[in-house]
UniProtKB/Swiss-Prot annotation:
Occurrences of domain RNase H type-2 (ranges): 79-269
Name the record gives this protein: Ribonuclease HII
Lineage of origin: Bacteria, Bacillati, Bacillota, Clostridia, Eubacteriales
Catalysed reaction, written as an equation: Endonucleolytic cleavage to 5'-phosphomonoester
GO biological process entries: DNA replication, removal of RNA primer; mismatch repair
Membrane-spanning ranges: none
EC number: 3.1.26.4
PROSITE patterns named in the record: RNASE_H_2 (PS51975)
Organism: Clostridium novyi (strain NT)
Lineage: superkingdom: Bacteria
Enzyme class: hydrolase
CDD domains, alphabetized: RNase_HII_bacteria_HII_like
UniProt family annotation: Belongs to the RNase HII family.
């Protein structure tokens, strides 16, 4: 493509699309030279944008590589490590969900790293959706499990929290040699298990588990919002926002509400 014959606005759109797609076939050094040699100031500045993009991508690869290396130090080459995390411990409605993910930790080429992984709460909805698909495609194995609000009411959130993590690990298609869980150890787990404080920001495997668990649960709550629109589950995901609590007081609870969590809100239970 001859950038010199393009309008500045078209060049800007072209560069934007390249950076979004992270096209591996692009010779970025040649592209930067072409932009910097252009007589138009706006086009020259796009060269700076590409340089900044490459610098940020390098930093991101280093950050994520460190997350992979964090996991690798726990196991020997050729063995499996699973990262496990849960989402939905605190909401007033909906299930608690956990995921376990086994990654290929022997990746040599940085191009194959799953970039942008992190604590799922620090990632936008759109990026989480995109990453969830990538994680599922590239994972050696993954498992997503849920425990309903009814079972939470019956057995308590502490038991369910541990149980859903245990189920996620036990339903993997490969047998991990070690499980890393976020925050605390999984009790009564037959597989060797260690916990990592703030693990979803340190461990690649835990971060990936955090992301796919949250995406699964968020999409489930969005579907529930179609059945129960008064509660705005598509916005609060079942958490106790002011609007959600007001809706409970006005309309009562649904089948997916955790009645054991509502004793201080309603006097019905």
């Amino acid at each position: 493509m001859n950038i010199g014959n393009m309008k500045a606005t078209d060049v800007k759109a072209y560069i934007s699309n390249i950076l979004k797609s992270e096209d591996k076939s692009i010779d970025y050094e040649a592209l930067i030279r072409t932009l910097e040699d252009d007589n138009r100031v706006t086009v020259k500045n796009l060269g700076k944008n590409v340089i900044k993009f490459l610098e940020n991508r390098k930093k991101e690869r280093i950050r994520v590589r460190n997350m992979y290396e964090f996991d690798k130090k726990y196991i020997k080459s050729g063995t499996y490590l699973a990262g496990a995390d849960e989402v939905g411990r605190g909401p007033l409605a909906g299930p608690i969900v956990a995921a376990a993910v086994v990654l290929d930790l022997d990746i040599i080429n940085d191009e194959n790293l799953i970039l942008r992984i992190n604590d799922s709460k620090k990632i936008s909805f759109e990026v989480r959706e995109e990453l969830s698909k990538i994680i599922k495609e590239r994972a050696v194995s993954y498992s997503i499990q849920e425990i309903s609000s009814e079972e939470i009411d019956e057995k308590g959130i502490a038991w369910c929290n541990n149980e859903v993590l245990k189920r996620s690990v036990c339903n993997l298609k490969v047998d991990p040699d070690l499980v890393l869980s976020d925050g605390y150890k999984i009790k009564n787990c037959t597989i060797n298990n260690e916990f990592v404080v703030k693990g979803d920001a340190k461990s690649a495997s835990i971060a990936c588990a955090s992301i796919i668990a949250k995406v699964y649960r968020d999409n489930l709550m969005i579907e529930y919002s179609k059945k129960y629109p008064e509660y705005m589950f598509n916005k609060n995901m079942g958490y106790g926002t002011k609007e959600h609590i007001e809706a409970i007081k006005k309309f009562g609870c649904t089948k997916i509400h955790r009645k054991s969590f509502l004793k201080n809100i309603l006097n019905t239970f």
